[in-house]
Amino acid sequence: MASGFLLCPVLLAVFFMSPVEVGAFPLYSLFTNAVIRAQHLHQLAADIYKDFERTYVPEEQRQSSKSSPSAICYSESIPAPTGKDEAQQRSDVELLRFSLALIQSWISPLQTLSRVFSNSLVFGTSDRIFEKLQDLERGIVTLTREIDEGSPRIAAFLTLTYEKFDTNLRNDDALMKNYGLLACFKKDMHKVETYLKVMKCRRFVESNCTL
């Protein structure tokens, strides 16, 4: 009974929309779902990074790894915006393509993530990330088709990907490699979240629109 009352405002909103607004309503839902998924994925990436850091990485190694050349992420090798101000200067299609590039660069590495941490504190988090990443990928592909006349063109940089996580957690080099990968994953998911929020905010005026 309660669910029926909850649907009424939505149905009334669609009923009183102009034809253009009715066409935009599904697009609003697509953006909303994508933003929610990106926020959740970014939070999961941050949680697993913190858990890994706390469990495996001494304080002195944390500082040295952040200044290491190996800490440079793939997203920094392509012309992707670094923050919301730069993102606002790009078109929606560009931001969607950058988002898709970043997501697809993690598809292969994240297939092994749960095996790497199968006996650790972060297993419960890592086991869900791959599935959620695929969900977000599908959502962004759908958005791109809606906005870019149904035929998204794949840029050359989409073929690049990160290395896979190392399963040998007793090796210092392997630990630091995984630590660097998790840092990049967190950074890249934050960028995807920012891009999607920028697009949604400038397409749909909302009182709670924050970046």
From Swiss-Prot:
Name the domain of life: Eukaryota
| Compartments, record wording | Secreted
Q: Which organism is it from?
A: Lepisosteus osseus
Q: Which family does it belong to?
A: Belongs to the somatotropin/prolactin family.
Swiss-Prot/TrEMBL keywords: Disulfide bond, Hormone, Metal-binding, Secreted, Signal, Zinc
Q: What does this protein do?
A: Growth hormone plays an important role in growth control and is involved in the regulation of several anabolic processes. Implicated as an osmoregulatory substance important for seawater adaptation.
Q: Which GO terms describe its cellular component?
A: extracellular space
List cystine links: C73-C184, C201-C209
Chaperone among keywords: no
Q: What is this protein called?
A: Somatotropin
Q: May I ask which residue range the UniProt record assigns to the signal sequence?
A: 1-23
